[in-house]
Each structure stands twice: as C-alpha cells, then as structure tokens.
C-alpha cells in the first residue's frame, strides 16, 4: 500500500483595477485580492502591464503612455512555491475621450 500524499490546492490570483477605462497618461491603481486556500500565504507578486512595464507588491500603480488595448497579468507565489496567475484586459482611451 502506498502512503497517502497530501494534495495542496493552488493559490487563487485575483485583482481589481481602478479606473477600469483609463485615459492615456492617467494613473491606474491595482489591488491584489489573491488568496491561498491552504493558508500558507502569498510570498510575492509580480505584475506585467502589457506595455513593457512591471511591478511588485500588493497595490502598485501604473500609467499607460499611449491609448490601446493591454493585458495586465498578476502572478503570485505562495511561501511553499505554488504559483497562480490572473489576467485582465484594459482598454486605454485617448486623453480627451469621454
């Protein structure tokens, strides 16, 4: 008989963006809402803004220089090395757009 192995659950990567429809040059704020069902905790976060910019931390901010469609990716890792990612598309409008 083989010994039982404990299967750990993957962390859940989640985040929100404010404002959801920014203008070029406007600062957006991101808020990590990730969790670890196993309770080990999130050790680090890496953000990729889709325009070459990156950040770490739970609540970074970012400015897109140009209007366009971008995908923001958050990757999180738990203290025991499990990874998860979440993606959100953001449509950055021209500075004068309503």
What do these predicted regions represent?
Residues 1-98:
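Extracellular/lumenal mature domains of secreted and surface-exposed proteins
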């Amino acid at each position: 008989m083989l010994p039982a192995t404990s299967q750990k659950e993957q962390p859940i990567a989640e985040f929100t963006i404010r404002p959801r429809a920014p203008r070029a040059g406007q600062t957006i704020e991101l808020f990590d809402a990730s969790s670890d069902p196993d309770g080990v905790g999130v050790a680090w976060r890496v953000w990729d803004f889709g325009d070459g910019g990156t950040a770490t931390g739970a609540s970074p901010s970012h400015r897109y220089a140009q209007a366009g469609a971008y995908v923001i990716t958050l990757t999180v890792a738990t203290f025991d090395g499990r990874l998860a990612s979440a993606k959100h598309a953001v449509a950055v409008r021209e500075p004068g757009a309503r």
